[in-house]
């Protein structure tokens, strides 16, 4: 899966229909997971509305659009659910996300920030959230600053 401008080497398989499903590896199972996991009408609209990153053209002449991978999609949904539950229960516990190098943590946080600021407006306690990203490397800090500034 990718966008119109995605280079071939960056296309990837959608290997789960729902969070918690086993990861598919056979070609037929991957095709089925892609069809059911991406192209069911409700899911497709959700992906199209909330999980495509468009870089602001003010910062670059290059047009950039990135669609989430399935782990980013399910992680964002799970984190949002955890944060909403925490706010409603006043537990003080939000969302924590740990990911391996190269798994798309920065984009996951961008997708989550979008969800919290645009899709949780009906939850008064969330309001206009302040989002803090804690990273352990300068490289991640610079990458995050660049991504959030350009989006």
Predicted regions and their residues:
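ATP-dependent helicase/translocase motor core
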Residues: 1-135, 139-151
């Amino acid at each position: 899966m990718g966008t119109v401008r995605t280079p071939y080497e960056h296309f990837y398989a959608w290997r789960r229909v729902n969070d918690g499903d086993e990861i598919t590896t056979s070609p037929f199972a991957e095709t089925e997971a892609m069809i059911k996991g991406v192209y069911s009408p409700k899911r497709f609209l959700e992906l199209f509305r909330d999980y495509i990153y468009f870089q602001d053209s003010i910062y670059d002449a290059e047009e950039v659009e990135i669609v989430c991978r399935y782990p980013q999609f399910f992680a964002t949904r799970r984190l949002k659910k955890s944060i909403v539950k925490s706010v409603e229960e006043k537990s003080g516990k939000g969302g924590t996300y740990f990911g391996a190098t190269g798994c798309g943590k920065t984009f996951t946080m961008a997708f989550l920030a979008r969800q919290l600021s645009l899709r949780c407006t009906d939850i008064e306690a969330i309001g206009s959230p302040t989002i803090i990203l804690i990273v352990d490397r300068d490289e991640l800090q610079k990458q995050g600053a660049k991504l959030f500034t350009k989006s």
